[in-house]
Amino acid sequence: MVVLDASALLAWFGGEPGADQVEQHMPCCCSTANWAEVVQKLTARGVGLGDIRSAVSLLGLVLEPVTTEDAETAATLWQDHPTLSLGDRLCLALGHRLAVPVLTADRAWSNQPPIVQIR
């Protein structure tokens, strides 16, 4: 199991570089905070919510709610990672809580464990 950040999930939806790496890590999970970002970006491009849900069912995507622990971890991550958004830090917090790697297509993230950059 791995955690996908919004950029990795969007890369998969768009058939962009790294999409194959996302598929190799099925089943996977995503924070509901990152899910909101994915849905917002795809619906802005004209993709229907039903189509989005159908597509992610192929991934075996599990949506994990943001917990109080995740929120507190994300808040403390700000000190070491001030350039990461709240959504990014919530993604990292979920990976920390589940003790699994986090896949991202975002080049701004480091490539240190538990972060795996897809290309």
Kindly give the residue locations of the regions a language model identified.
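Residue-level detector of structured alpha->beta connecting loops
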Residues: 26-27, 60, 82, 99
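Alpha-helix capping/helix-boundary segments
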Residues: 8-9, 34, 70, 90-91, ...
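Short, well-structured N-terminal submotif of metal-dependent ribonuclease cores
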Residues: 1-30, 41-54
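Acidic, PIN/NYN-like endoribonuclease modules and their adjacent C-terminal/linker elements
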Residues: 92, 96-119
